[in-house]
Protein backbone atom coordinates (compact mmCIF):
# COMPACT_ATOMS: atom_id res chain seq x y z
CA UNK A 1 0.00 0.00 0.00
CA UNK A 2 1.52 3.33 -1.05
CA UNK A 3 1.32 6.55 0.98
CA UNK A 4 -1.64 8.07 -0.91
CA UNK A 5 -3.74 4.91 -0.45
CA UNK A 6 -2.83 4.81 3.24
CA UNK A 7 -3.87 8.45 3.70
CA UNK A 8 -7.16 7.87 1.84
CA UNK A 9 -7.89 4.77 3.95
CA UNK A 10 -7.34 6.58 7.25
CA UNK A 11 -9.15 9.75 6.07
CA UNK A 12 -12.55 9.82 7.84
CA UNK A 13 -11.94 6.29 9.13
CA UNK A 14 -14.65 3.74 8.31
CA UNK A 15 -16.84 6.14 6.29
CA UNK A 16 -17.78 4.78 2.81
CA UNK A 17 -15.35 5.56 -0.01
CA UNK A 18 -17.99 7.47 -2.01
CA UNK A 19 -18.54 9.71 1.03
CA UNK A 20 -14.81 10.40 1.39
CA UNK A 21 -14.65 11.32 -2.32
CA UNK A 22 -17.62 13.68 -1.87
CA UNK A 23 -15.88 15.56 0.95
CA UNK A 24 -12.62 15.78 -1.01
CA UNK A 25 -14.57 17.11 -4.02
CA UNK A 26 -16.25 19.74 -1.81
CA UNK A 27 -12.86 20.85 -0.48
CA UNK A 28 -11.51 21.20 -4.03
CA UNK A 29 -14.45 23.03 -5.65
CA UNK A 30 -15.26 25.50 -2.83
CA UNK A 31 -12.20 27.77 -3.34
CA UNK A 32 -12.71 27.62 -7.13
CA UNK A 33 -16.34 28.76 -6.82
CA UNK A 34 -15.42 31.43 -4.25
CA UNK A 35 -12.57 33.01 -6.27
CA UNK A 36 -13.67 32.42 -9.87
CA UNK A 37 -17.49 32.27 -9.86
CA UNK A 38 -19.17 34.13 -6.97
CA UNK A 39 -18.69 34.37 -3.18
CA UNK A 40 -22.51 34.38 -2.82
CA UNK A 41 -22.87 31.09 -4.73
CA UNK A 42 -19.88 29.66 -2.82
CA UNK A 43 -21.62 30.54 0.45
CA UNK A 44 -24.84 28.75 -0.47
CA UNK A 45 -22.79 25.80 -1.76
CA UNK A 46 -21.06 25.56 1.63
CA UNK A 47 -24.43 25.64 3.45
CA UNK A 48 -25.73 22.81 1.21
CA UNK A 49 -22.55 20.78 1.81
CA UNK A 50 -22.79 21.23 5.57
CA UNK A 51 -26.44 20.07 5.52
CA UNK A 52 -25.24 17.04 3.53
CA UNK A 53 -22.73 16.15 6.27
CA UNK A 54 -25.54 16.37 8.85
CA UNK A 55 -27.77 14.13 6.75
CA UNK A 56 -24.98 11.51 6.66
CA UNK A 57 -24.51 11.54 10.45
CA UNK A 58 -24.91 7.75 10.71
CA UNK A 59 -22.19 7.21 8.07
CA UNK A 60 -19.73 9.64 9.67
CA UNK A 61 -20.09 12.02 12.61
CA UNK A 62 -20.48 15.53 11.05
CA UNK A 63 -17.77 17.14 13.20
CA UNK A 64 -14.88 15.96 11.02
CA UNK A 65 -16.22 16.58 7.47
CA UNK A 66 -18.15 19.69 8.53
CA UNK A 67 -15.12 20.91 10.46
CA UNK A 68 -12.82 20.54 7.45
CA UNK A 69 -15.27 22.55 5.32
CA UNK A 70 -15.44 25.23 8.04
CA UNK A 71 -11.64 25.43 8.39
CA UNK A 72 -11.28 25.85 4.63
CA UNK A 73 -14.01 28.54 4.61
CA UNK A 74 -12.03 30.58 7.16
CA UNK A 75 -8.73 29.92 5.35
CA UNK A 76 -9.97 31.23 1.97
CA UNK A 77 -11.61 34.31 3.51
CA UNK A 78 -15.34 33.44 3.48
CA UNK A 79 -15.31 34.60 7.11
CA UNK A 80 -12.69 35.51 9.71
CA UNK A 81 -11.52 33.86 12.95
CA UNK A 82 -12.58 37.04 14.76
CA UNK A 83 -16.16 36.74 13.47
CA UNK A 84 -16.25 33.04 14.39
CA UNK A 85 -15.18 34.01 17.91
CA UNK A 86 -17.91 36.69 17.96
CA UNK A 87 -20.58 34.11 17.00
CA UNK A 88 -19.31 31.71 19.68
CA UNK A 89 -19.41 34.43 22.37
CA UNK A 90 -22.88 35.54 21.21
CA UNK A 91 -24.09 31.95 21.65
CA UNK A 92 -22.01 31.13 24.71
CA UNK A 93 -25.16 30.31 26.72
CA UNK A 94 -25.86 27.42 24.34
CA UNK A 95 -22.29 26.10 24.75
CA UNK A 96 -22.53 26.30 28.55
CA UNK A 97 -25.88 24.51 28.36
CA UNK A 98 -24.41 21.65 26.32
CA UNK A 99 -21.32 21.32 28.49
CA UNK A 100 -22.96 21.39 31.92
CA UNK A 101 -26.71 20.84 31.66
CA UNK A 102 -26.48 17.60 29.67
CA UNK A 103 -23.78 16.37 32.07
CA UNK A 104 -26.01 17.38 35.00
CA UNK A 105 -28.89 15.29 33.64
CA UNK A 106 -26.49 12.30 33.57
CA UNK A 107 -26.33 12.38 37.37
CA UNK A 108 -30.15 12.34 37.61
CA UNK A 109 -30.41 9.25 35.40
CA UNK A 110 -31.20 6.88 38.30
CA UNK A 111 -34.29 8.88 39.32
CA UNK A 112 -35.43 9.50 35.74
CA UNK A 113 -35.20 5.82 34.79
CA UNK A 114 -37.10 4.84 37.94
CA UNK A 115 -39.94 7.33 37.32
CA UNK A 116 -40.29 6.67 33.58
CA UNK A 117 -40.10 2.88 34.06
CA UNK A 118 -43.10 3.18 36.39
CA UNK A 119 -44.85 5.29 33.74
CA UNK A 120 -44.12 2.75 31.00
CA UNK A 121 -45.35 -0.18 33.08
CA UNK A 122 -48.53 1.50 34.35
CA UNK A 123 -49.66 3.10 31.05
CA UNK A 124 -50.33 0.24 28.60
CA UNK A 125 -52.11 2.35 25.95
CA UNK A 126 -49.63 3.54 23.29
CA UNK A 127 -51.85 6.56 22.51
CA UNK A 128 -51.92 7.70 26.14
CA UNK A 129 -48.19 7.04 26.53
CA UNK A 130 -47.34 9.01 23.36
CA UNK A 131 -49.59 11.85 24.48
CA UNK A 132 -48.00 11.90 27.94
CA UNK A 133 -44.49 12.11 26.40
CA UNK A 134 -45.59 14.86 23.99
CA UNK A 135 -47.39 16.93 26.65
CA UNK A 136 -44.73 16.48 29.35
CA UNK A 137 -42.06 17.61 26.85
CA UNK A 138 -44.25 20.58 25.86
CA UNK A 139 -44.84 21.58 29.49
CA UNK A 140 -41.18 21.25 30.46
CA UNK A 141 -40.01 23.12 27.34
CA UNK A 142 -42.25 26.05 28.23
CA UNK A 143 -40.15 26.58 31.37
CA UNK A 144 -36.86 24.86 30.57
CA UNK A 145 -34.74 24.85 27.43
CA UNK A 146 -35.78 22.32 24.76
CA UNK A 147 -32.22 20.91 24.72
CA UNK A 148 -32.49 20.09 28.42
CA UNK A 149 -35.80 18.31 27.85
CA UNK A 150 -34.39 16.26 24.96
CA UNK A 151 -31.34 15.39 27.10
CA UNK A 152 -33.74 13.99 29.73
CA UNK A 153 -35.69 11.97 27.14
CA UNK A 154 -32.48 10.58 25.58
CA UNK A 155 -31.21 9.59 29.04
CA UNK A 156 -34.47 7.74 29.78
CA UNK A 157 -34.61 6.07 26.34
CA UNK A 158 -31.00 4.88 26.62
CA UNK A 159 -31.82 3.43 30.04
CA UNK A 160 -34.82 1.48 28.67
CA UNK A 161 -32.84 0.24 25.67
CA UNK A 162 -29.90 -0.83 27.83
CA UNK A 163 -32.10 -2.85 30.21
CA UNK A 164 -33.72 -4.89 27.43
CA UNK A 165 -30.52 -5.20 25.35
CA UNK A 166 -28.72 -6.84 28.29
CA UNK A 167 -31.45 -9.46 28.71
CA UNK A 168 -31.75 -10.07 24.94
CA UNK A 169 -27.96 -10.60 24.83
CA UNK A 170 -28.20 -13.28 27.52
CA UNK A 171 -26.74 -11.08 30.28
CA UNK A 172 -28.15 -10.09 33.66
CA UNK A 173 -29.27 -6.59 34.69
CA UNK A 174 -26.04 -6.11 36.66
CA UNK A 175 -23.71 -7.10 33.82
CA UNK A 176 -21.74 -4.45 31.96
CA UNK A 177 -22.34 -4.93 28.22
CA UNK A 178 -21.86 -2.98 24.98
CA UNK A 179 -25.41 -2.00 24.01
CA UNK A 180 -24.25 -1.02 20.51
CA UNK A 181 -23.21 -4.62 19.77
CA UNK A 182 -26.03 -6.92 18.57
CA UNK A 183 -23.83 -9.98 17.85
CA UNK A 184 -25.16 -11.95 20.84
CA UNK A 185 -28.80 -11.26 19.95
CA UNK A 186 -30.03 -14.12 17.76
CA UNK A 187 -33.58 -15.13 18.71
CA UNK A 188 -34.80 -11.70 19.83
CA UNK A 189 -33.84 -9.61 16.78
CA UNK A 190 -37.43 -9.06 15.59
CA UNK A 191 -38.53 -7.95 19.06
CA UNK A 192 -35.52 -5.62 19.30
CA UNK A 193 -36.51 -3.99 15.97
CA UNK A 194 -40.07 -3.50 17.27
CA UNK A 195 -38.69 -1.97 20.47
CA UNK A 196 -36.49 0.37 18.42
CA UNK A 197 -39.54 1.52 16.43
CA UNK A 198 -41.45 2.03 19.69
CA UNK A 199 -38.65 4.17 21.16
CA UNK A 200 -38.25 6.15 17.91
CA UNK A 201 -41.92 7.14 17.95
CA UNK A 202 -41.83 8.17 21.62
CA UNK A 203 -38.69 10.24 21.06
CA UNK A 204 -40.14 12.03 18.03
CA UNK A 205 -43.40 12.79 19.88
CA UNK A 206 -41.32 14.26 22.72
CA UNK A 207 -39.07 16.21 20.32
CA UNK A 208 -42.06 17.83 18.60
CA UNK A 209 -43.65 18.40 22.02
CA UNK A 210 -40.56 20.38 23.02
CA UNK A 211 -41.17 22.67 20.02
CA UNK A 212 -44.89 23.02 20.87
CA UNK A 213 -44.06 24.15 24.40
CA UNK A 214 -40.93 26.08 23.46
CA UNK A 215 -42.84 28.54 21.24
CA UNK A 216 -45.17 29.62 24.07
CA UNK A 217 -42.89 31.38 26.56
CA UNK A 218 -39.89 33.71 26.53
CA UNK A 219 -37.67 31.07 28.19
CA UNK A 220 -38.76 28.19 25.95
CA UNK A 221 -36.14 28.76 23.23
CA UNK A 222 -32.96 30.91 23.14
CA UNK A 223 -34.31 33.16 20.36
CA UNK A 224 -37.47 33.81 22.40
CA UNK A 225 -35.34 35.66 24.96
CA UNK A 226 -33.86 37.81 22.19
CA UNK A 227 -37.33 38.56 20.76
CA UNK A 228 -38.74 39.40 24.21
CA UNK A 229 -35.77 41.66 24.95
CA UNK A 230 -36.10 43.60 21.67
CA UNK A 231 -39.89 43.92 22.05
CA UNK A 232 -39.62 44.78 25.78
CA UNK A 233 -42.10 42.05 26.76
CA UNK A 234 -42.22 40.37 30.17
CA UNK A 235 -42.99 36.66 30.76
CA UNK A 236 -46.79 37.08 30.98
CA UNK A 237 -47.03 39.55 28.07
CA UNK A 238 -44.99 37.21 25.84
CA UNK A 239 -47.28 34.30 26.76
CA UNK A 240 -50.46 36.32 26.02
CA UNK A 241 -49.23 37.84 22.74
CA UNK A 242 -48.18 34.47 21.31
CA UNK A 243 -51.26 32.57 22.62
CA UNK A 244 -53.54 33.28 19.57
CA UNK A 245 -51.06 31.24 17.51
CA UNK A 246 -49.46 28.87 20.04
CA UNK A 247 -52.70 27.50 21.56
CA UNK A 248 -54.38 26.43 18.27
CA UNK A 249 -51.04 24.91 17.21
CA UNK A 250 -50.76 23.00 20.52
CA UNK A 251 -54.30 21.61 20.18
CA UNK A 252 -53.70 20.52 16.57
CA UNK A 253 -50.30 19.08 17.55
CA UNK A 254 -51.96 16.91 20.21
CA UNK A 255 -54.59 15.79 17.68
CA UNK A 256 -51.81 14.91 15.21
CA UNK A 257 -50.05 12.83 17.88
CA UNK A 258 -53.22 10.79 18.53
CA UNK A 259 -54.07 10.37 14.83
CA UNK A 260 -50.55 9.18 13.96
CA UNK A 261 -50.74 6.52 16.67
CA UNK A 262 -54.28 5.51 15.68
CA UNK A 263 -53.57 5.07 11.95
CA UNK A 264 -49.98 3.83 12.46
CA UNK A 265 -48.47 5.92 9.66
CA UNK A 266 -45.12 7.72 9.15
CA UNK A 267 -43.30 5.25 11.40
CA UNK A 268 -45.62 5.65 14.39
CA UNK A 269 -48.00 3.21 16.08
CA UNK A 270 -45.59 0.43 17.13
CA UNK A 271 -46.59 -0.87 20.56
CA UNK A 272 -44.22 -1.91 23.33
CA UNK A 273 -43.53 -5.63 22.72
CA UNK A 274 -45.00 -7.79 25.48
CA UNK A 275 -41.67 -9.49 26.15
CA UNK A 276 -39.94 -6.11 26.59
CA UNK A 277 -42.70 -4.99 28.95
CA UNK A 278 -42.07 -8.17 30.97
CA UNK A 279 -38.32 -7.45 31.14
CA UNK A 280 -38.90 -3.84 32.28
CA UNK A 281 -41.49 -4.96 34.86
CA UNK A 282 -39.05 -7.57 36.21
CA UNK A 283 -36.29 -4.95 36.29
CA UNK A 284 -38.59 -2.60 38.22
CA UNK A 285 -39.43 -5.28 40.82
CA UNK A 286 -35.74 -6.16 41.17
CA UNK A 287 -34.84 -2.49 41.65
CA UNK A 288 -37.49 -2.16 44.36
CA UNK A 289 -36.25 -5.28 46.17
CA UNK A 290 -32.58 -4.27 46.06
CA UNK A 291 -33.13 -0.61 46.86
CA UNK A 292 -31.34 0.35 50.05
CA UNK A 293 -31.89 3.31 52.34
CA UNK A 294 -28.87 4.93 50.71
CA UNK A 295 -30.40 4.48 47.22
CA UNK A 296 -33.62 6.16 48.36
CA UNK A 297 -31.64 9.07 49.81
CA UNK A 298 -29.76 9.44 46.51
CA UNK A 299 -33.03 9.56 44.56
CA UNK A 300 -34.47 12.09 47.01
CA UNK A 301 -31.40 14.29 46.44
CA UNK A 302 -31.83 13.93 42.66
CA UNK A 303 -35.52 14.87 43.03
CA UNK A 304 -34.59 18.01 45.01
CA UNK A 305 -31.99 18.84 42.34
CA UNK A 306 -34.75 18.42 39.73
CA UNK A 307 -37.02 20.84 41.60
CA UNK A 308 -34.18 23.37 41.79
CA UNK A 309 -33.59 22.86 38.06
CA UNK A 310 -37.22 23.68 37.16
CA UNK A 311 -37.51 26.62 39.59
CA UNK A 312 -34.12 28.06 38.63
CA UNK A 313 -34.83 27.94 34.91
CA UNK A 314 -38.48 29.02 35.11
CA UNK A 315 -37.52 32.11 37.14
CA UNK A 316 -34.31 32.57 35.11
CA UNK A 317 -32.24 32.79 38.31
CA UNK A 318 -29.04 32.05 36.37
CA UNK A 319 -27.93 31.03 32.88
CA UNK A 320 -28.97 27.52 31.90
CA UNK A 321 -25.40 26.19 31.85
CA UNK A 322 -24.62 27.61 35.30
CA UNK A 323 -27.72 25.92 36.74
CA UNK A 324 -26.53 22.71 35.05
CA UNK A 325 -23.17 23.06 36.81
CA UNK A 326 -24.96 23.43 40.17
CA UNK A 327 -26.86 20.19 39.39
CA UNK A 328 -23.54 18.39 38.80
CA UNK A 329 -22.09 19.72 42.07
CA UNK A 330 -25.20 18.97 44.18
CA UNK A 331 -25.78 15.46 42.80
CA UNK A 332 -22.13 14.38 42.94
CA UNK A 333 -21.46 15.91 46.38
CA UNK A 334 -24.50 14.44 48.13
CA UNK A 335 -24.51 11.12 46.24
CA UNK A 336 -20.84 10.51 47.03
CA UNK A 337 -19.48 10.63 43.46
CA UNK A 338 -16.01 12.13 43.92
CA UNK A 339 -13.88 10.07 41.51
CA UNK A 340 -12.58 12.18 38.62
CA UNK A 341 -13.16 9.42 36.04
CA UNK A 342 -16.74 8.84 37.20
CA UNK A 343 -17.46 12.55 36.81
CA UNK A 344 -15.67 12.63 33.45
CA UNK A 345 -18.03 10.02 31.97
CA UNK A 346 -20.90 12.53 32.20
CA UNK A 347 -19.09 14.80 29.71
CA UNK A 348 -18.47 12.10 27.09
CA UNK A 349 -21.88 12.54 25.42
CA UNK A 350 -22.20 16.35 25.19
CA UNK A 351 -18.63 17.30 24.20
CA UNK A 352 -18.64 16.04 20.56
CA UNK A 353 -21.92 17.88 19.95
CA UNK A 354 -20.55 21.02 21.62
CA UNK A 355 -17.62 20.93 19.18
CA UNK A 356 -20.07 20.42 16.29
CA UNK A 357 -22.13 23.44 17.41
CA UNK A 358 -18.96 25.60 17.32
CA UNK A 359 -18.37 24.42 13.73
CA UNK A 360 -22.00 25.32 13.01
CA UNK A 361 -21.38 28.85 14.31
CA UNK A 362 -18.56 29.11 11.75
CA UNK A 363 -21.09 28.39 8.99
CA UNK A 364 -23.38 31.02 10.54
CA UNK A 365 -20.47 33.51 10.39
CA UNK A 366 -20.12 32.74 6.67
CA UNK A 367 -23.87 33.35 6.18
CA UNK A 368 -23.53 36.76 7.88
CA UNK A 369 -20.31 37.87 6.13
CA UNK A 370 -21.50 36.87 2.65
CA UNK A 371 -24.99 38.30 3.33
CA UNK A 372 -26.67 35.11 2.12
CA UNK A 373 -30.02 35.97 3.72
CA UNK A 374 -29.97 39.71 2.90
CA UNK A 375 -32.02 39.55 -0.35
CA UNK A 376 -34.80 37.65 1.44
CA UNK A 377 -34.79 40.01 4.45
CA UNK A 378 -34.93 43.11 2.23
CA UNK A 379 -37.77 41.63 0.18
CA UNK A 380 -39.88 40.91 3.29
CA UNK A 381 -39.30 44.32 4.89
CA UNK A 382 -40.18 46.15 1.67
CA UNK A 383 -43.45 44.21 1.21
CA UNK A 384 -46.95 45.61 1.75
CA UNK A 385 -47.79 45.78 5.53
CA UNK A 386 -50.87 43.57 5.03
CA UNK A 387 -48.76 40.72 3.65
CA UNK A 388 -45.74 41.23 5.94
CA UNK A 389 -46.92 38.84 8.68
CA UNK A 390 -47.37 35.96 6.24
CA UNK A 391 -44.04 36.67 4.52
CA UNK A 392 -42.14 36.93 7.83
CA UNK A 393 -43.65 33.63 8.96
CA UNK A 394 -42.97 31.78 5.68
CA UNK A 395 -39.41 33.03 5.11
CA UNK A 396 -38.48 32.62 8.79
CA UNK A 397 -39.75 29.07 8.56
CA UNK A 398 -37.90 28.26 5.34
CA UNK A 399 -34.60 29.74 6.55
CA UNK A 400 -34.95 28.06 9.96
CA UNK A 401 -35.21 24.69 8.22
CA UNK A 402 -31.70 25.09 6.77
CA UNK A 403 -30.02 27.30 9.37
CA UNK A 404 -30.03 27.77 13.13
CA UNK A 405 -33.39 29.23 14.22
CA UNK A 406 -31.62 31.31 16.89
CA UNK A 407 -29.56 33.01 14.18
CA UNK A 408 -32.56 33.51 11.86
CA UNK A 409 -34.72 34.93 14.67
CA UNK A 410 -31.93 37.27 15.81
CA UNK A 411 -31.22 38.62 12.30
CA UNK A 412 -34.89 39.25 11.50
CA UNK A 413 -35.57 40.80 14.92
CA UNK A 414 -32.62 43.19 14.64
CA UNK A 415 -33.74 44.31 11.17
CA UNK A 416 -37.34 44.75 12.34
CA UNK A 417 -36.24 46.78 15.38
CA UNK A 418 -34.19 49.01 13.06
CA UNK A 419 -37.30 49.49 10.87
CA UNK A 420 -39.32 50.49 13.97
CA UNK A 421 -36.64 52.93 15.17
CA UNK A 422 -36.50 54.60 11.74
CA UNK A 423 -40.31 54.93 11.67
CA UNK A 424 -40.67 52.53 8.74
CA UNK A 425 -43.26 50.44 10.66
CA UNK A 426 -45.65 51.24 13.54
CA UNK A 427 -45.33 49.83 17.07
CA UNK A 428 -48.53 47.78 16.59
CA UNK A 429 -47.13 46.24 13.40
CA UNK A 430 -43.79 45.61 15.15
CA UNK A 431 -45.50 43.62 17.93
CA UNK A 432 -47.37 41.48 15.39
CA UNK A 433 -44.18 40.92 13.36
CA UNK A 434 -42.35 39.86 16.55
CA UNK A 435 -44.97 37.12 17.06
CA UNK A 436 -44.59 36.11 13.39
CA UNK A 437 -40.81 35.84 13.84
CA UNK A 438 -41.19 33.81 17.03
CA UNK A 439 -43.68 31.34 15.56
CA UNK A 440 -41.93 31.24 12.18
CA UNK A 441 -38.60 30.23 13.70
CA UNK A 442 -40.09 27.71 16.16
CA UNK A 443 -42.80 25.82 14.26
CA UNK A 444 -41.76 25.06 10.63
CA UNK A 445 -38.18 24.41 11.84
CA UNK A 446 -39.26 20.97 13.14
CA UNK A 447 -39.03 19.87 9.48
CA UNK A 448 -35.27 19.17 9.66
CA UNK A 449 -32.74 18.43 12.40
CA UNK A 450 -30.69 21.52 11.46
CA UNK A 451 -33.57 23.85 12.32
CA UNK A 452 -33.62 23.18 16.05
CA UNK A 453 -30.56 22.54 18.21
CA UNK A 454 -32.57 20.01 20.25
CA UNK A 455 -33.33 17.97 17.11
CA UNK A 456 -29.70 18.14 15.98
CA UNK A 457 -28.59 17.02 19.45
CA UNK A 458 -30.97 14.04 19.22
CA UNK A 459 -29.73 13.09 15.73
CA UNK A 460 -26.03 13.23 16.69
CA UNK A 461 -26.45 11.59 20.11
CA UNK A 462 -25.08 8.04 20.66
CA UNK A 463 -28.70 6.93 21.16
CA UNK A 464 -29.79 7.75 17.56
CA UNK A 465 -27.81 4.93 15.87
CA UNK A 466 -28.97 2.47 18.55
CA UNK A 467 -32.61 2.98 17.56
CA UNK A 468 -31.76 3.53 13.85
CA UNK A 469 -32.88 7.16 13.84
CA UNK A 470 -31.26 8.69 10.75
CA UNK A 471 -31.52 12.19 9.25
CA UNK A 472 -33.96 11.07 6.54
CA UNK A 473 -36.06 9.09 9.01
CA UNK A 474 -36.31 12.12 11.31
CA UNK A 475 -37.52 14.26 8.40
CA UNK A 476 -40.02 11.55 7.40
CA UNK A 477 -41.38 11.14 10.93
CA UNK A 478 -41.54 14.91 11.47
CA UNK A 479 -43.34 15.50 8.14
CA UNK A 480 -46.97 15.22 9.38
CA UNK A 481 -46.16 17.48 12.33
CA UNK A 482 -44.38 19.94 10.01
CA UNK A 483 -47.40 20.17 7.71
CA UNK A 484 -49.98 20.54 10.51
CA UNK A 485 -47.96 22.95 12.69
CA UNK A 486 -46.91 25.13 9.76
CA UNK A 487 -50.39 25.40 8.20
CA UNK A 488 -52.25 25.94 11.50
CA UNK A 489 -49.61 28.48 12.58
CA UNK A 490 -49.95 30.34 9.27
CA UNK A 491 -53.75 30.63 9.41
CA UNK A 492 -53.76 31.51 13.13
CA UNK A 493 -51.21 34.25 12.42
CA UNK A 494 -53.21 35.63 9.49
CA UNK A 495 -56.77 35.41 10.83
CA UNK A 496 -56.62 35.12 14.65
CA UNK A 497 -53.59 37.13 15.79
CA UNK A 498 -54.53 40.70 14.61
CA UNK A 499 -58.18 40.71 15.86
CA UNK A 500 -57.40 38.89 19.13
CA UNK A 501 -54.43 41.18 19.84
CA UNK A 502 -56.71 44.20 19.34
CA UNK A 503 -59.38 42.62 21.56
CA UNK A 504 -56.90 41.83 24.37
CA UNK A 505 -55.54 45.40 24.15
CA UNK A 506 -59.09 46.76 24.53
CA UNK A 507 -59.63 44.51 27.55
CA UNK A 508 -56.45 45.90 29.13
CA UNK A 509 -54.60 42.57 29.01
CA UNK A 510 -51.93 44.10 26.77
CA UNK A 511 -50.24 47.49 27.00
CA UNK A 512 -50.46 49.71 23.90
CA UNK A 513 -47.02 51.29 23.54
Curated annotation (Swiss-Prot):
It catalyses: 2 Na(+)(in) + 3 H(+)(out) = 2 Na(+)(out) + 3 H(+)(in). The chain crosses the membrane at residues 21-41, 43-63, 88-108, 137-157, 202-222, 235-255, 299-318, 322-344, 350-370, 389-409, 477-497. One of its GO terms (molecular function) is sodium:proton antiporter activity. Its main location: membrane. It holds the Pfam family NhaB. InterPro entries: Na+/H+_antiporter_NhaB. It is a multi-pass membrane protein. GO terms for cellular component: plasma membrane. Coiled coil: none annotated. It comes from the Bacteria. Keywords: Antiport, Cell inner membrane, Cell membrane, Ion transport, Membrane, Sodium, Sodium transport, Transmembrane, Transmembrane helix, Transport. It is found in: Cell inner membrane. Na(+)/H(+) antiporter that extrudes sodium in exchange for external protons. Belongs to the NhaB Na(+)/H(+) (TC 2.A.34) antiporter family. This is Na(+)/H(+) antiporter NhaB. It comes from Haemophilus ducreyi (strain 35000HP / ATCC 700724).
